[in-house]
A protein has these predicted regions:
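Conserved S-adenosyl-L-methionine
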Residues: 188-199
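Class I SAM-dependent methyltransferase SAM/SAH-binding core
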Residues: 55-57, 61-106
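A short glycine-rich, Lys/Arg-flanked "PGG" loop and its adjoining helix->strand segment in the class I
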Residues: 129-141
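A short SAM/SAH-binding and catalytic strip from SAM-dependent methyltransferases
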Residues: 116-129
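A short acidic, Gly/Pro-enriched loop at the edge of an enzyme's catalytic core
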Residues: 105-117
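Conserved class I S-adenosyl-L-methionine
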Residues: 2-48, 63-67, 146-170
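Short alpha-helix
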Residues: 171-187
Length: 215
């Protein structure tokens, strides 16, 4: 399988942390507050796009990928994650999803193999330029990318981002304009970008969802 994207050694601190947090990640409160709102928006976009070969990058314990398979029933669904602990949980969740151990910067797909890529609340952990280059490589012309990432604005949110950056470097939540620029540089037309609010208290740090179409 071909790959033109540069790669990096995936941050072992991040991977190890998510291995340890895999069971906590699945709790109802964590999912409802942090993850469910952008996942709902992502599924709605995939439904509108009628996507048939979909990969969830940074899939974690597989909740979104399993929902995509169950609710949309596309031809193929792939869940990709760099954390073995997360993937262990995911494999037990849905055997109809193909679960793959890999990083966003070096995806295990042929050129043009997919028609949609999604990533929710994980993009800040990627080498973002390398990742979107890979997204463009594995998507066919007209393929959809959906990126939902936390948007840090205001002094409290910026302080949280600084702590995250110091603890989990090279993690970085891009500003909305950065995400648009990354996609355009990689060969995407930006279709839409909007905030997705979580329940309180996490309205302080909303998600921004960005949609791109492969040129």
């Amino acid at each position: 399988m071909n790959s033109t994207a540069p790669t990096r050694g995936f941050n072992e601190v991040i991977t190890g942390s998510f291995d340890r947090l895999a069971r906590v990640y699945d709790t109802a409160l964590v999912q409802q507050v942090f993850y469910r709102p952008p996942q709902d928006e992502t599924i709605a976009e995939l439904r509108r796009n009628r996507s048939r070969r979909i990969a969830d990058i940074g899939c974690g314990t597989g909740i979104l990928a399993a929902r995509i398979q169950r609710e949309l029933q596309p031809d193929q669904v792939f869940g990709v994650d760099a954390s073995p602990g997360m993937l262990e949980q995911a494999r037990a969740r849905n055997p109809l999803v193909t679960w793959l151990h890999s990083t966003a910067e070096s995806l295990p797909f042929d050129d043009g193999a997919l028609d949609a890529i999604v990533t929710t609340t994980a993009f800040h952990f990627f080498d973002q330029r390398a990742a979107v280059t890979e997204f463009a490589r594995v998507l066919g012309a007209g393929g959809l990318v959906v990126i939902a990432t936390m948007h840090y604005s205001g002094p409290l949110a910026r302080g949280i981002q600084q702590v995250t950056r110091n603890s989990f470097a090279p993690a970085h939540a891009p500003a909305p304009g950065e995400t648009r620029e990354l996609l355009r540089d990689a060969g995407f037309d930006v279709l839409d970008q909007r905030k997705v609010h979580r329940p309180l208290p996490n309205r302080l740090i909303p998600d921004v969802i960005t949609l791109g179409r492969r040129r």
